[in-house]
Amino acid sequence: MKAAEIREKFLKFFESKGHTIVRSSSLVPGNDPTLLFTNSGMVQFKDVFLGAESRPYSRATTAQRSVRAGGKHNDLENVGYTARHHTFFEMLGNFSFGDYFKRDAIHYAWELLTGVYQLPKDKLWVTVYHEDDEAHDIWAKEVGVPVERIIRIGDNKGARYASDNFWQMADTGPCGPCSEIFYDHGPDVWGGPPGSPEEDGDRYIEIWNLVFMQFNRDAQGNMTPLPKQCVDTGMGLERIAAVLQHVHSNYEIDLFQALIKAAARETGVSDLTNNSLKVIADHIRACSFLIVDGVIPGNEGRGYVLRRIVRRAIRHGYKLGKKGSFFHRMVADLVAQMGAAYPELKEAEQRVTDVLRQEEERFFETIEHGMSILEGALAELEAGSSKTLDGELAFKLHDTYGFPLDLTADVCREREVTVDEAAFDEAMTRQREQARAAGKFKMAQGLEYSGEKTTFHGYDEVVFDDAKVIALYVEGASVQQASQGQQAVVVLDHTPFYAESGGQVGDQGVLANASVRFAVSDTLKVQADVVGHHGTLEQGTLKVGDVVKAEIDAVRRARTARNHSATHLMHKALREVLGTHVQQKGSLVDADKTRFDFAHNAPLTDEQIRRVEEIVNAEVLANAPGIVRVMSFDEAVKGGAMALFGEKYGDEVRVLDLGFSRELCGGTHVHRTGDIGLFKIVMEGGVAAGIRRVEAITGDNAVRFVQDLDARINAAAAVLKAQPSELTQRIVQVQDQVKSLEKELSALKSKMASSQGDELAGQAIEVGGVHVLAATLEGADVKTLRETVDKLKDKLKSAAIVLASVEGGKVSLIAGVTADASRKVKAGELVNFVAQQVGGKGGGRPDMAQAGGTEPANLPAALAGVKGWVESQL
């Protein structure tokens, strides 16, 4: 039974039992930004289990795409070397949300395994939590599993309820016992039943875990029954396929064999048992589906995990002798295997291929040099007694050659060498500190402060009349007063000034009273809720305890707000035009523009840019109100607000609804979309592999931009004596005229050169039977020089010729030698003889060579020496 059929039978079986088939969710969890990747079937139902979300069904079944690589769940180093470790796998599951419980879950599992899949009953063993008599009795008395094949597993992890057979979502919350089903491969395979000293062997393989969410655990460890008991089960498709296909390794199932053969084809390897082929076959699945779900190779977060997996696959291909791109060509093979089950893979095939090809090309630029350095270091270790690679070297490989630490460790492991990870971490920390010191980091980040928090009023006010100075810093040190002319940081108890955050720059403005004026040039956070006002004391003496009027530059704030609100609309529009894989990777919003970096693997076309502008400006014209609500993070995400992985969110978040956009945002914004005014994209380009950047302007800036553009178009039209509407046509006409004139000019130059060539032939001097000619051809370009040399060679029969021209202070040289003379006189050596004297160099074939120089004053003497040089060669 093939993997595709196993998947289909699972889903159809539970559909027949009243379950709704639910599509696999994204590998990027939409409801939990703290989770790196979706790693089980229950992730998309987490809020349902917690009671925070309701679904129109109480029974569900899924085939969930899952990844375990990076973070807590990291199987990367074992992938390819064991029978059952993968970065990507499919989890088949059935779920009950307050509907059926243990009895039905157990009976369903048994019916599917023994009835639909027709596994021998005597090959199946089960485990239960040692206190779960209910599950034990259902297995023994109702299903009929012999008690000797039902194993009670106790608290084998050192504490009450700390057991392989007791599941917990977290330290508190829903939890309960679980029952695992094992398949016995028979006595020919080493290993013992679960709970025995030999349980790590391969004879008894877990194929299905049935989790019974029965209790709620509080902070004190007390267990109380849940009002709605739930079921969460998970069976790895690859594991059950290995059992049903009578093989002992997941890599031997049909799905993997097809990918292993594809890897062998691309790397030219014939041994299909090679572990590197298994690595590549596994990694093409993880990489492709991560890209499908919007992850792009990068240097942080999910993007860096993806980059590590891609580069590990490339390294194993390199190990097999593949010195060029190959990995991306396997996407088509994966689509053939899994495209029917996951149409989103088929739809994204070209995008996935392009992203992988770009990442391969990027790494192949450095892998050979990096591997050479690593191999040299390993050879030195083998010659000595140490078995530890220097962490500083591992960091150099990471920093200079793009080798992730686990890739270096992977290579070392094959030689039984470890990496000094502590030294690697020290080098990484040192580099970060140097980067911070070298970067433009403002004083606020290093200030020591332990006072009260700043209350922010800037969402509603641009002025706060009675703000009290609660701290002062000069040159990074806490002081009680600042004097006129000093630069300082002022901390207030209340402020309307927005501190730089979320890509939005800090406010500028003034702090003042009757005797003091402090010009604020920037606003930064000293701590999460403490605002530092950076600037210069222009008048008076400012003391801790003084009361000042805090007033922001309202015009600058309004422009910044327009740009920030436009960023939200543009983000949404980009996702509509390019696809939901578009994710924000960085932004900068100030009074002049918005700069937005996002995940996308190709330049935007003119039509795509125009479409984004149309969508945003349509939202502006709709003049929709901006609605701000404060709510819990879970409620915000449930309501569709976009949350960014890696951002830190508190228990309560600020949600901005603006037109068709809904995002979590703490920045300042317009009251209505119409306040944005005109929106115009002025730049689009790439900033890194898979990352594009768009810059846009709004309001009066956009109007001025369009007016300036209009003025330039009108001026250009006037120069070309055309109407603006006819400008393109007129430019094409001028280009055609220029091409025609260039063609005529080239013909005239050729004719002139031919004429000069006839005259120059008479200047040749015979030396040892070879006609030697060295001369300057006025006004000739390189093409004309070459044509003239060819004609002179034909005319003179046996010759060594150097022709030169001077244009803009630069010398062009062409040397030509006829075939009979080139055995002794080489054109490359001849042209270099002249070039070295005019400050240049060159080279070429024995019969024709080219050079240049920058010292035309030396040209006459250099050409005069050609005759003597040729004589010396004959």
From Swiss-Prot:
PROSITE patterns: AA_TRNA_LIGASE_II_ALA. Its cofactor is Zn(2+). SUPFAM superfamilies: Class II aaRS and biotin synthetases, Putative anticodon-binding domain of alanyl-tRNA synthetase (AlaRS), ThrRS/AlaRS common domain, Translation proteins. Zn(2+) binds at residues 564, 568, 665, 669. CDD domains: AlaRS_core. Signal peptide: none annotated. Binds 1 zinc ion per subunit. It is an enzyme of class 6 (ligase). Its EC number is 6.1.1.7. It is found in: Cytoplasm. Keywords: Aminoacyl-tRNA synthetase, ATP-binding, Cytoplasm, Ligase, Metal-binding, Nucleotide-binding, Protein biosynthesis, RNA-binding, tRNA-binding, Zinc. HAMAP family: Ala_tRNA_synth_B (MF_00036_B). Consists of three domains; the N-terminal catalytic domain, the editing domain and the C-terminal C-Ala domain. The editing domain removes incorrectly charged amino acids, while the C-Ala domain, along with tRNA(Ala), serves as a bridge to cooperatively bring together the editing and aminoacylation centers thus stimulating deacylation of misacylated tRNAs. This is Alanine--tRNA ligase. It comes from Paraburkholderia xenovorans (strain LB400).
